[in-house]
């Protein structure tokens, strides 16, 4: 293999880097990546003899054909969808039970589906929780396409499933039969084996020990770990559960030592490690980081070391896992591995380890910012401390306890993990909030990565290092503070939230979204771990825009769809003050929620102005102190840049009449329709008088109340107002300097 590598015309790391640009040019249809690839090709022909460069071009052509073929296959699969499914084979290790909700991945006719089902009884729930063997399920269900991206910078579930080879979701209406079956498929049997291990651990070990055992040994974290998952994430150390080189090395080395003690030769052992690698990969759910680590370990067996090892791993991943670099896990895994490879020869000892941790943290920062928009500075120290604890203590300890459990489960050590979780809770309370950097666009990301690479390369040249440091600071500043004005109506489902920020960084948030509480009573077994709308929509968007502080949070009314996620938002961001109407303070439950935020609350009156965009938002209503109902909604109006905006909260027809009576000459270009398009708002008289050029409606897709109402839609059509709806267009955003340009996610 080493001889084969020597025949490559250019260093292997250069080739892998060149092909990475080509990969993104094809799979992401990125003109920027294509430009980068062409630029590197030109440099190649300048730097190397044409004959050698020509050979590289041939290699690029072969990989380009492979990438195009894979991309075409995925395109065909997304177009040639199944019409119906009556039978699926359950992949046992994908089973997830959350309250009365069941989800798993199932195979049918060569396709994989993401399957959902509402469990009908506690007995049925227990049966699926205990299911470990391969089963075929006969069913009645409905196929649909996965939900795509709904907010700028938001999670794209459809794109994620596509990287897993899944193009449709299946909602089961009725299970007709469940039959245990045999299979010769290696993947299915490994899925069953992994599920058996998970269920064994869950039934023989107490909480929280079992979560750490399934997490560190099998890469499986269940819904009952949700609270701790959030704490580890907020501290920037959730990657401790991402199986990687340390775990792979631990198990591979242990396997080799065991077989060598049994008398096997090195030659036979080399081939057995391939079988072990396949089984271990299956037991960890074919995790991206495990696959990468195993490949590097296997290549090292053949004498491929250092950068050649990493580069060849990348080339193999291009072939065996074409979607690897389209996932956050894949990109981060390779980024960590690359930086480790680059810094591995810089000495030994505690000082070298500390330097390595610093280089890794800084080097990975732009990529972390791109995917998560924030960074926890405490993660430097916490990773340094807890990685030793997890890798050198917990991993071997839990491995031994798991092996012993088949003879006698040792559960007396559960107190160690209870102590650990207590310590994590304490640290999360005293630690500062993560630093919000924002999400860099593709140009900024590439410039940041190149700049950091130059910093590492020129680290001994103080003058150049100073210039580069200033450049990097400027790039991060542009990421956190985009030099533009924006008004964004986010897609928060059947709720409402509008974000305003001007070029100076002044921020106003109108409502926070939420979910109306259900009166339906549920049994204990049906209770599930849930996340709020804000945690899935509003909070990620604001962080992607670099927002760490909201200067003024305006709550227009007390409906849960407008204020339900108040606590989540005030926990995630520093809020300068909360502005409410005087009437809303008569609602005791609402006042209690305001007090729980521990934030300054101020009631506003008609005529009060809130400066932003070089202009101001004026409070037009309510003129009288009401009881906090819909007509007690705060109504905001202002000329923002070149257009007049009117935000009406949940104002109904009576309130609209009063508004027109007080302001008969109101000029409105953009109207935010009241009550999500309910027919009780946006009356004919109101619309005929204002004649807004555009109307914004925040409404949930396929909402139960079927809003916006047809009458409202007809009225808006009658005045030729251009309607933007979040259920159809996703998030809607106005951007600009002196005038607005409108864009939507869809």
Kindly label every feature range from the protein language model.
Residues 1-77, 292, 743:
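N-terminal leader/targeting segments
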Residues 341-438, 694:
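Alpha-helical transmembrane segments of multi-pass integral membrane proteins
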Residues 2-4, 61-239, 536-540, 549, ...:
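Membrane-interface helix/helix-cap signal primarily in integral membrane proteins
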Residues 127-128, 137-142, 153, 182-185, ...:
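Non-globular, low-confidence helical/coil segments that flank catalytic cores
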Residues 2, 165-294, 552, 644-647, ...:
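Aromatic-rich juxtamembrane segments at the membrane interface
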Residues 25, 29-32, 39-49, 54-60, ...:
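Hydrophobic alpha-helical transmembrane segments in multi-pass membrane proteins
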Residues 4-15, 52-55, 209, 213, ...:
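Membrane-interfacial loop-to-transmembrane alpha-helix junctions, especially the N-terminal start
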């Amino acid at each position: 293999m080493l001889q084969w590598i020597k025949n490559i015309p250019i260093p292997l790391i250069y080739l892998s880097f060149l092909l990475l640009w080509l990969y993104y040019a094809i799979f992401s249809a990125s003109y920027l990546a294509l430009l980068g690839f062409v630029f590197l090709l030109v440099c190649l022909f300048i730097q190397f003899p044409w004959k050698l460069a020509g050979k590289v071009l041939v290699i690029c052509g072969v990989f380009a054909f492979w990438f195009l073929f894979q991309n075409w296959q995925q395109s065909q699969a997304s177009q040639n969808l199944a019409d119906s499914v009556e039978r699926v084979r359950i992949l046992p290790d994908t089973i997830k039970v959350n309250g009365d909700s069941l989800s798993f991945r199932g195979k049918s006719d060569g396709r994989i589906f993401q399957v959902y089902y509402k469990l009908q009884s506690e007995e049925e729930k227990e049966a699926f929780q205990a299911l470990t063997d391969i089963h075929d399920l006969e069913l009645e269900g409905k196929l649909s396409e996965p939900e795509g991206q709904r907010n700028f910078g938001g999670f794209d579930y459809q794109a994620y499933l596509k990287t897993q080879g899944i193009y449709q979701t299946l909602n089961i209406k009725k299970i007709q039969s469940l039959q245990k079956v045999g299979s010769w498929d290696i993947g299915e049997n490994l899925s069953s084996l992994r599920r058996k291990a998970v269920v064994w651990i869950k039934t023989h070990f107490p909480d929280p020990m079992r979560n750490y055992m399934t997490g560190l040994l099998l890469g499986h974290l269940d819904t009952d770990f949700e609270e701790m998952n959030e704490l580890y994430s907020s501290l920037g150390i959730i990657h401790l559960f991402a199986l990687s080189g340390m775990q792979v090395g631990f198990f591979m080395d242990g396997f080799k030592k065991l077989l060598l003690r049994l008398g096997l030769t090195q030659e036979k052992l080399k081939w057995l490690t391939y079988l072990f690698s396949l089984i271990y990969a299956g037991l960890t759910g074919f995790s991206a980081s495990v696959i990468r680590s195993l490949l590097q370990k296997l290549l090292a067996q053949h004498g491929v070391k250092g950068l050649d090892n990493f580069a060849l791993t990348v080339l193999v991943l291009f072939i065996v896992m074409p979607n690897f670099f389209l996932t956050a896990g894949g990109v981060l895994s390779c980024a960590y591995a690359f930086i480790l490879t680059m810094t591995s020869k810089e000495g030994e000892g505690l000082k070298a380890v500390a330097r390595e941790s610093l280089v890794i943290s800084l080097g990975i920062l732009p990529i972390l910012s791109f995917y998560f928009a924030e960074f926890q500075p405490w993660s430097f120290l916490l990773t340094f401390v807890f990685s030793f604890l997890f890798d050198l203590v917990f991993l071997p300890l839990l491995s031994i306890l798991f092996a012993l459990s088949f003879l006698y489960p040792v559960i007396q050590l559960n107190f160690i993990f209870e102590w650990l979780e207590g310590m994590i809770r304490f640290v999360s309370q005293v630690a500062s909030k993560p630093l919000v950097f924002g999400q860099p666009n593709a140009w900024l990301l590439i410039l940041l990565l190149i700049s950091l690479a130059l910093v590492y390369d020129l680290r001994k040249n103080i003058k150049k290092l100073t210039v580069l440091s200033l450049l990097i600071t400027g790039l991060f500043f542009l990421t956190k503070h985009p030099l533009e004005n924006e008004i964004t109506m986010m897609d928060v489902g059947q709720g409402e939230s509008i974000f305003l920020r001007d070029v100076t960084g002044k921020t106003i948030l109108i409502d926070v979204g939420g979910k109306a509480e259900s009166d339906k009573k549920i049994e204990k077994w049906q209770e599930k771990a849930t996340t709020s709308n804000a945690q899935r929509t509003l909070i990620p968007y604001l962080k992607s825009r670099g927002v760490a502080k909201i200067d003024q949070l305006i709550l227009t009314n007390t409906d849960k769809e407008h204020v339900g996620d108040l606590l989540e938002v005030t926990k995630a961001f520093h809020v300068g003050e909360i502005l409410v109407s005087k009437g809303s303070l008569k609602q005791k439950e609402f006042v209690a929620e305001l007090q729980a935020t521990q934030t300054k609350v101020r009631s506003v009156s008609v005529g009060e102005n809130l400066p932003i965009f070089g202009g101001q938002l004026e409070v037009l209503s309510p003129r009288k102190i009401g009881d906090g109902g819909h007509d007690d909604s705060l109504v905001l109006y202002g000329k923002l840049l070149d257009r007049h905006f009117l935000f009406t909260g949940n104002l109904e027809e009576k309130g609209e009449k009063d508004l027109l009576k007080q302001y008969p000459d109101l000029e409105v270009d953009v109207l935010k329709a009241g009550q999500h398009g309910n027919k009780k708002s946006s009356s004919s008289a109101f619309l005929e008088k204002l004649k807004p050029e555009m109307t914004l409606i925040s409404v949930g897709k396929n909402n139960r109340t079927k809003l916006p109402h047809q009458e409202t839609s007809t009225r808006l059509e009658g005045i030729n107002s251009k309607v933007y709806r979040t259920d159809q267009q996703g998030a809607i955003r106005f951007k600009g300097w002196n005038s607005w340009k409108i864009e939507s996610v869809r």
